[in-house]
Amino acid sequence: MVAATASVTTVDGVYPSPHFEGAEKRIEIDFHANETNARGLREVTRAQLDECMAAAHCEIVSVRSNAKFDAYVLSESSLFVFPTKLVLKTCGTTNLLAGVPTILKYASQVGMESRRVKFTRSSFDKPDLQPKLHASFDDETIFLEEHFGHLSPGGGSSYILGSKLKGVQWHLYVSGSACQWQDAQPKASLEVCMTHLNREHCEKHFYRKEETFVSSAQTTTDSGIRSIFEDFAIDDYVFEPCGYSMNGLNKLSATDSQFSTIHITPEDGFSYASCELSNVDVEELDVFSYVRQVASVFKPGKMVFAISIDGVNAADVSGDVLAAGGFIPGYSRVQATRQEFDVEGVIAYYTYERSDGLRSAHSLPNVARGAALLKGHPFSFANAADAERPLTPPCVMDFPSSDHSDDGRWSGCSNTDEDC
């Protein structure tokens, strides 16, 4: 039985941090270019995007743009909008797929027609608390096939990578053509998902304490996150009472279509962090160097990561990308899986666990039924061990639009699209 949804309100206009189900759902939709609309999807208005996000049970709280795309921090994760690509990533019990019909409707209104979709997620910690469309991967696949199956002859393809006996699995649905131009270079994305986070690191950086908090930008630097993305303009948040999100836009002109995003749920019992780097030219990606850097900052007890390469010759170049070696200091590889897509792409999936003896001493135990819920959290229980775990709170829907104050705090905003 699904637990009742927790009531969500803001205190002094501050949005409570996402929690419980850290694992994100992610959809990437590519569209055909429109010669009469060079801005493509970026012509979809802010009000229309707000409607799309409301359908998915989340909100836009900030936006940062460059010449290539717009990056939105959401109440639960992130949205990226390019002229011919949209990437939506949401955590908790958000209803990501419920936002797809509205997205396609407004894309059609600006003359954009979908040509490829890729949906990914890891295993849910509490799948029984997910909304109906995400109740199982079969349910998700049925929905995706109804909306995107026509993009591939014979329909799309679905895959589950990794062994259920060895931990988290990776779920993937893909349909359509990866490249509009045959000479287009393959692009890579790398998603790192971490649990059992280092307790000391979380308590020091990702809990908003009035006596020590300076700004979200300072948190990004002090926590080590800035060192991972030195060439990125970062839009960052420290939520109250805890939690962290950021979007990064590469500042270098040669690579300014690259984006990154990090989301952290630091609470005892369900600690989780994700770190993504996407839209990278294959020859520029050093997979294991990047993962080693991420692991050195967060020091998780467990982590999984997926490297996805999309392009007409993705399978040919994937060996070079993954040949650098899989050694990560302090960790042992539990499993590795590689899968070629039926439609121009390949994915590799890895699971690593801490092997240096520090996991039990310094990592957060992810326990069943929220038995170690933080007492100070607005959705904790006096007797958590005997309580049903509630849904991750849905976003607050009564704000017309949103922005953030100078210190990185989220607050409601009633400005125009241009101002927000």
Q: Can you say where each PLM-predicted feature lies in the sequence?
A:
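Polybasic/polar functional segments that serve as interface/processing modules
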Residues: 1-420
